[in-house]
Amino acid sequence: MKYNSKDKDSIREYARKLLNSSLREFYGQELTHRFNNRKAKGRLGQVIEEEFFGYKVNSNKEADFKEASIELKVAPLKAIKVKEKSSLLREQKGISAKERIVLSIIDYMEVAKETWDNNSLMKKCRELLLMFYLNEKDVAVEDLKFELINLWTPSDEDMKVIEQDWNIIVNKVKEGRAEEISEGDTLYLGACTKGSTADKSKRKQPFSDVEAPQRAFCLKRSYVDSIIEELMVRESYIHHEKYKSVSDKIKEVSFDKA
């Protein structure tokens, strides 16, 4: 095993081997066979799971790295107009979240039995390993570069908002109104539709005979932007500390020679 699946730091540091690299740069031509189907959705995420981390894609209720309680999410960035004078690092660099981050399918029959204190979503997704890559038009998937990779968990303040959002969504299920759920209801945690079409992807709900569109818990795109900013600030700090460490060592050597 190239990393310790029980150790968060080991998982994070192994993931960060892809930072500023593409899969082709990391593997060479070894994985060409995995990218033949150009229309397959989620291909990059699947290859990261199966080839890079070495576990099979699944829909388990547990986190991807269950022994470390970490869920993996591979997500795209998009290029935006650079704003050099912006106070936001992501705007200075010219990147933004391309889409929401989908967390898990909502099982209306099961979620109606839950409370916030015992909810299955946070058991699975309390801490995320986020791997953001820059999505570029006409660039092969294996050549897309990873720009941000790190562990992330919501702050206490954000968690309060997420709890409120969760209750808004789940209360509609408990009231037999799952078909009325809308992403506009909430701030950070959303409930996006999932499936080929809303009509074909319907699920039963416990307190109504009306079938509701299949939905998934997700982190809303605007909130993902704030997560990206947080990770960029942390990355900036990491680089500063590394530079500071190297600078201090150079000074030590210089003084020793003096």
Sequence positions of predicted segments:
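Nucleic-acid endonuclease domains
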Residues: 1-65, 74-258
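Conserved active-site neighborhood of enzyme catalytic/cofactor-binding cores
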Residues: 70
